[in-house]
Design a protein with these regions (language model features):
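Gly/Ser-rich "nucleophile elbow"/oxyanion-hole loop immediately N-terminal to the catalytic nucleophile
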Residues: 190-236
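N-terminal cap/lid segment of alpha/beta-hydrolase-fold proteins
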Residues: 8-14, 67-70, 78-125
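Short, aromatic- and glycine-rich surface loops/edge beta-strands on solvent-exposed regions
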Residues: 30-42
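C-terminal catalytic histidine-bearing segment of alpha/beta-hydrolase fold enzymes
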Residues: 322-360
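Cap/lid segment of the alpha/beta-hydrolase catalytic domain
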Residues: 137-210, 264-276
Length: 360
């Protein structure tokens, strides 16, 4: 047993065969308790990894944002606005004849273009736009970079599959392996170097966010866009990209995200919460990328659906995700799943789920 109160309990106990195993604990402050249990000798996936929260409505960001948060992002967006789109489109073979598929490349700040695939229905008409973003490791994998399937190029919406790193999509594995190595710093993976993260100007995520925003800005200029609905979609790092972009581009109306990453970095560093057990250690520059700070700035008439949050996910810890949810000032929904880690969920049927919604 661990938790946002810093308490740790461990031990072994016999398993009753005719009734549930019951473990009783408590927490004296708003936050979550995590319970990890496994059946001795039964294999790695015969386990429980989940938890419970107390005073859910009072689980909020523990420390304030930088005083110059808005000034910093205004400065960066103003610099981005000085760079022309200069869109370069290369039509490629489409997985379905009813859809036109192209690689896109857009002018952007911070030395790298905004890139990805765009699929547009060929039938005359106006369509909503969907921007897809991908997880940390996933963003280097074929799931993010390979040519879309027919299912990923629908006939009822415009889809941009945005490359997180400003790379050309549809290349071979060696290309991405070399690019991933180059994106690292001081032996850390992209975005993990504490020296880079000491200042927001040198954080890897700054360029990533500007590339994402640039893709959304360009999408607004497409003659096929219906001018009404623009949706962002992604999980983990892709969930962060979705909400970063939504906060900085007010044309975005909807978000569908799961296990969103980068929430309430200071909660672990200064508040004693159970923080992420993977990736970046806290550094001051990360305050400018904390997703809770962006959530406050999403337009109040938008809609955010966090359709999956794991109660055993301590890459994206529940207290941080709850803080994100409570910072949103728009209609919202969150679905908590019991016995669910970041990339593993119990195969058992009938897992406990808890859903919260709010009209504002």
């Amino acid at each position: 047993r661990t938790g946002d109160d810093g308490k740790v309990e461990e031990g072994t106990a016999p398993i009753p065969f005719r009734e549930p195993f019951v473990y009783t604990t408590s927490i004296a402050k708003p936050g979550f308790v995590r319970l990890f249990a496994e059946v001795v000798g039964a294999g790695p996936n015969v386990k429980f990894d989940g938890g419970a929260g107390a005073a859910f409505d009072r689980i909020v960001q523990m420390h304030g944002e930088p005083d110059d948060f808005d000034a910093f992002w205004k400065r960066e967006l103003d610099a981005l606005a000085q760079v022309p789109f200069d869109p370069q489109l290369e039509e490629v073979a489409s997985p379905r004849p009813e859809v036109k598929l192209s690689r896109f490349r857009l002018g952007c700040a911070k030395g790298k273009p905004s890139t990805g695939f765009i699929s547009v229905p060929r039938a005359p008409g106006k369509y909503p736009v969907r921007l897809y973003f991908f997880g940390y490791n996933e963003s280097w994998s074929p799931r993010a970079t390979a040519f879309p399937t027919a299912q990923q190029a629908p006939t009822n919406e415009i889809v941009l599959r945005v490359n997180a790193h400003g790379l050309e999509n549809g290349r071979d594995a060696a290309y991405y392996a070399a690019a991933r190595k180059a994106a690292g710093s001081n032996g850390y993976g992209h975005g993990f170097d504490p020296a880079e993260n000491a200042k927001p100007e040198t954080c890897y995520y700054l360029g990533m966010i500007l590339r994402d925003v640039r893709a959304a800005q360009w999408a607004k200029t497409l003659p096929e866009w219906d001018g009404r609905k623009m949706l962002v979609y992604g999980g983990s790092q892709g969930g962060a990209q979705s909400l970063w972009t939504m906060a900085l581009e007010p044309a975005i109306t909807d978000a569908e995200v799961f296990i969103p990453w980068m929430c309430d970095w200071r909660g672990k560093a200064f508040g004693g919460r159970s923080g992420t057990d993977w990736g970046s250690e806290y550094a001051p520059g990360l305050d400018y990328f904390d997703l809770v700070n962006f959530a406050k700035r999403i337009r109040p008439d938008a809609y955010v659906n966090i359709f999956h949050a794991g109660l055993g996910d301590y890459i994206c810890p529940p207290a941080g995700v709850a803080s994100l949810y409570h910072a949103l000032r728009c209609p919202k929904r969150i679905r908590w799943v019991q016995n669910c880690e970041h990339s593993w969920s119990s195969p058992a049927k009938g897992k406990q789920e808890t859903v919260f919604t709010s009209p504002h």
